[in-house]
């Protein structure tokens, strides 16, 4: 009997269980997307990847620029990945640690997105391409390119994490409310169900905007950075992050659709129950003239 009761319990609440499953998948996708490039273990979840193009005619100039000092030798081979919460630098030369007094060395290191200007690599990755004389002055101005600064600008100024953070918090809140209405014999379920409809629609709208902005930011960097750097820097789009963003949106949309269908089903069931209630006999028909003429026959 217990097994039958459990089967009936889950069968009756299967739509809400699907909603919980969709919600839980969305939470995991959004969290892994948020912490991408926060440490070397999850740097594969990047938004944009930058590196110097070794086919560029300026590549030899970049090599010579880094060869001027033993501390920067080989930095032209670095790969920089930009994420929501941080920036990861990969393929760091092995000799770089000895010249910078690093106690432990790894060829990959990640920094928080707003704490880059103070790290040694930020200054060491600056390259001076040429000196251009001004038409109004005999003095020459330096043309400086910093690949790490471009990655920082992507994470700080182009693709912001705040919409994603708000979506994660609201999605976790929605999971708790769905879990609440799934448990039987709890009060205020009607109010919570109505609130869930509003909350799910808000989350879909919020992350819909966030996913579209992520798509725009990734493609803007992909198209603008190579041209603006005279094709010195190549850019690769983070397909994994883009897929996670759109799949999480799809699951949130499914979640909202399921909740609306459950609400409409419950409203229809309630209406059918009200319609099936038999009408009570009118106690005011005390005289034969008050009733139908069919009942007034002698």
UniProtKB/Swiss-Prot annotation:
| UniProt-listed Pfam families | Fig1 (PF12351)
- Indicate where the modification Phosphothreonine is found in the sequence: 293
Q: Where in the cell is it found?
A: Membrane
Question: What domain of life?
Answer: Eukaryota
Assigned GO CC terms? fungal-type cell wall; fungal-type vacuole; mating projection tip; membrane
Its transmembrane ranges are 17-37, 163-183, 195-215, 243-263
> Among the record's GO biological process terms, what is one?
cell morphogenesis involved in conjugation with cellular fusion
Q: What is the predominant subcellular site recorded for this chain?
A: membrane
Q: Does the keyword Phosphoprotein apply?
A: yes
Modified residue annotations for Phosphoserine: 288, 296
Q: What is the effect of changing residue 241 to T?
A: In strain: CLIB 388 haplotype Ha2
The protein's matches in InterPro entries, at most eight in alphabetical order, are given as: Dni1/Fig1, Fig1
Task: Identify its membrane topology class.
Answer: Multi-pass membrane protein
Specify the inducers. By mating pheromones.
Instruction: Enumerate the UniProt keywords alphabetically.
Output: Membrane, Phosphoprotein, Transmembrane, Transmembrane helix
Stated role: Required for efficient mating.
Q: What is this protein called?
A: Factor-induced gene 1 protein
Q: Which organism is it from?
A: Saccharomyces cerevisiae (strain ATCC 204508 / S288c) (Baker's yeast)
Q: What is the lineage of its organism?
A: Eukaryota, Fungi, Dikarya, Ascomycota, Saccharomycotina
């Amino acid at each position: 009997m217990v097994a039958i009761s459990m089967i009936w319990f889950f069968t009756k609440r299967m739509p809400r269980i699907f909603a919980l499953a969709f919600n839980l998948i969305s939470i995991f996708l959004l969290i892994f997307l948020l912490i991408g490039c926060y440490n070397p273990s999850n740097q594969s979840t990047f938004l944009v990847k930058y590196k110097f193009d070794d086919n560029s005619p300026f590549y030899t100039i970049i090599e010579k620029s880094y060869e001027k000092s033993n501390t920067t030798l080989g930095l032209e081979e670095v790969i920089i990945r930009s994420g929501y919460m941080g920036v990861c630098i990969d393929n760091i030369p092995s000799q770089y640690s000895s010249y910078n007094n690093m106690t432990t060395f790894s060829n990959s290191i990640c920094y928080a997105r707003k704490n880059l200007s103070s790290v040694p690599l930020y200054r060491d990755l600056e390259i001076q391409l040429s000196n251009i004389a001004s038409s109004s002055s005999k003095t020459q101005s330096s043309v400086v390119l910093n690949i790490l600064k471009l990655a920082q600008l992507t994470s700080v100024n182009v693709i912001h994490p705040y919409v994603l953070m708000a979506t994660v918090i609201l999605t976790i809140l929605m999971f708790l409310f769905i879990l609440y209405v799934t448990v039987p014999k709890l009060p205020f379920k009607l109010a919570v169900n109505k609130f869930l409809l509003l909350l799910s629609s808000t989350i879909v709208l919020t992350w819909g905007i966030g996913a579209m902005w992520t798509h725009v930011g990734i493609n803007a960097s992909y198209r603008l950075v190579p041209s603006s750097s005279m094709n010195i820097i190549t850019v690769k789009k983070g397909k994994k992050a883009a897929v996670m963003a759109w799949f999480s949106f799809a699951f949130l949309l499914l979640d909202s659709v399921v909740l609306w269908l459950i609400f409409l089903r419950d409203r229809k069931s309630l209406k059918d129950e009200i319609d099936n209630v038999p009408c009570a006999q009118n106690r005011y028909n005390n005289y034969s003239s008050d009733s139908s003429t069919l009942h007034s026959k002698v």
